[in-house]
Structure formats: C-alpha cells, structure tokens
Regions:
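Solvent-exposed soluble domains appended to multi-pass membrane proteins
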Residues: 1-327
Length: 327
C-alpha cells in the first residue's frame, strides 16, 4: 500500500498515517480527480481502519457499522454482499479509484466457526480434510464477489477501461498446527501439496492484475514478485508522475533485477533464496553464483530495510511533501 518494508516495532500502517502518503495509488489518482472510496465488510474501527484508510488517498471509508449498510451480521461477513451493496454507489462516478479489504476468507476454518464455509461447502469438490475444504469454501465467496463485480462492469460497458488488482494479505496461518486454532496437524502442507514447509514456500502466492481489454492475453511474470512491487508497477501502468527511488519495490514488467525480501533479512531472487536464520544461500535450479553476488544482495536488502525504517521514524514522506508543496 505505501511501498515500504513493514517496521519491526509495530504496525507499519498505524505509524505511517502520521505523514503524507502522497505516493499511494489512492493519493496519486485522487490528484487526477478520480472518485475515491474504500470499503471493508468487517467492523470500521478494527485496527483503527476508520483512521488509516482515508490517509491512503480515499475520500470516504465505509465498513460494517460505519456507513456500509446491509451487511449480514455473521462471521466472517460476505464479500459478495459488500460488492453488490457498494458497486451501485460508484459505478456511474467515472473515473473511480476503489479499494476493497475483503474478509470472507478469514479464519477459523470449520463449519461451526465460519459462516462462509457453511454457505459454500457443497460447492467445493475436495476429498481431503474437512479443515482444508472449509478453507476453500470460505475463499469461494471472493470468487463469487469478483464474478459479480466483473458482470456489473460489463453491463455498464466499462470493463475494458477498468483495472482490477487482487493481492493476498498473508498466508493462512490458521491452518498451521496450533493449539490456538485447534489443529493437531499442519494443514498448510495439505493445502500447498508439499511435505515440508519453509518461509519461501509458505509465503508463495499470486498477484492478479486484470482488465477486460486483456481477456485474450495471458501475461505471466515468472520472476519473484511481492507486495512492495505493486505500487511501482501500477504507477507505471497508469503513467503516473512519481519518483521510483522513493519506493522499495520494482516495476515487475521492467528489466530491473527481481528481489523479494522479508523484514528479518531473508530474501529471494531469480538466482536463489537466502535464509537469514541459518545464513544459508540456496541457488535456484540450474543457477551458480559466487559469494560476491550473495554479499551484494544482502547489502541491498539491508539498505532497503534501513531506508524503510528511517522514512517512518523521521516521517520523511511528510518532510518531502512539505518541501514539494513549498511549506
């Protein structure tokens, strides 16, 4: 969202709202007079989202018990309901910049604990454990929400001029072996189809960028990509005027060297992975690199983490914003 490595002293978002986040997609599009709104189908004040989301560049934040009326009071709430309630509010306000934080796929994953698992359980064809089947059933709600969103965009005749970006929040930690979640075994390995789990496998997922005009094209980036690459990638796709040096990530469609990093200094490139805990570099299949390569990437990772920390500690974005605006 803000292009920085999360701080190790608390929630990055809560700290960042005390400065001008002028590089977010919300703010950049807001300057171009896009209609803007952020939606969430859980409680408005959870994690102070009622305070943080307007700082991301959205004129209004609507959530359950916070302006988003009609959400059924179950846990977790329905993403499909959120889409169907919210789309009519902005679909005629073109161009628009809309942010959704979905919740239907949240834990826990059982028929007793999860309303979305109960709702969609019979839609899932899966022969494994009930826990994983409940997880998959819960995720189906977002699938149906996206089907509804795209259908409404198509009916309005604007699907070809709309970009949808879907990014995961975190791995499904409630599937891990844990007394907290009542799991006697690690269901993550079942879901991922592996026998062993490390952080590089655990955190693997996908970023989806969709537009109706790209339906016939299947562009796939094979190099490592992560959440901090989203902001520079979208900024370039939209032709926005920004300084890429201020962002940690890269444009994934550029020839910039790919790099994915973790706040604890582990990292992954197209050449291999480095585990900071064991201080071990494992080359990717068919790759050979020398120690100088590993040392160079370690230094880059350290600098990016230090930069992110100092931007937050010194409120550098606010200082820069004041300077650019002549304050």
């Amino acid at each position: 969202m803000i292009g920085l490595v999360p701080a190790d002293v608390g929630m990055c978002m809560k700290q960042a709202v005390y400065q001008d986040l002028f590089l977010t997609m919300g703010h950049q599009l807001q300057k171009l007079d896009y209609y803007s709104a952020a939606y969430h189908n859980h409680f408005a004040d959870f994690y102070d989202r009622n305070k943080t989301h307007t700082k991301l560049g959205y004129d209004r934040f609507l959530a359950r018990y916070g302006g988003l009326e009609g959400i059924t009071p179950v846990w977790p709430e329905s993403d499909l309901e959120m889409i169907d309630i919210s789309v009519p509010q902005y679909i005629d306000q073109q161009p628009f910049s809309i942010y959704y934080m979905t919740v239907s796929g949240h834990c826990g994953y059982s028929l007793k604990a999860n309303a979305m698992s109960r709702k969609n359980y019979d839609l899932v064809d899966y022969d494994g454990s009930e826990t994983v089947k409940c997880y998959l059933a819960a995720q189906m709600e977002l699938e149906m929400a996206m089907e509804s969103l795209i259908r409404q965009l198509e009916e309005a005749g604007i699907a070809d001029d709309t970009v949808i970006v879907i990014s995961p929040d975190h791995y499904p930690y409630a599937l891990e072996r844990s007394a907290t979640w009542g799991n006697a075994e690690n269901y993550l390995t079942e879901l991922y189809g592996v026998t062993e789990m490390d952080r590089f496998t655990r955190d693997s997922n996908a970023l989806i960028i969709w537009s109706g005009c790209l339906e016939d094209k299947n562009l796939k980036v094979e190099t490592p990509v992560y959440s901090l690459d989203i902001l520079p990638t979208l900024s370039n796709l939209f032709g926005l005027d920004y300084d890429s040096r201020l962002l940690v990530g890269r444009d994934v469609f550029s020839d910039t060297e790919p790099l994915v990093l973790w706040p604890e200094y582990s990292w992954k490139t197209d050449k291999g992975t480095y585990d900071s805990g064991s201080r071990t570099f494992t080359p990717a299949e068919g790759m050979e690199v020398d120690d100088s390569y590993v040392d160079r990437i370690k230094a880059i990772v350290s600098n990016k983490i230090s930069y992110s920390r100092e931007v937050q500690n010194l409120k550098y974005f606010q200082v820069l914003s004041d300077f650019l605006n002549g304050k």
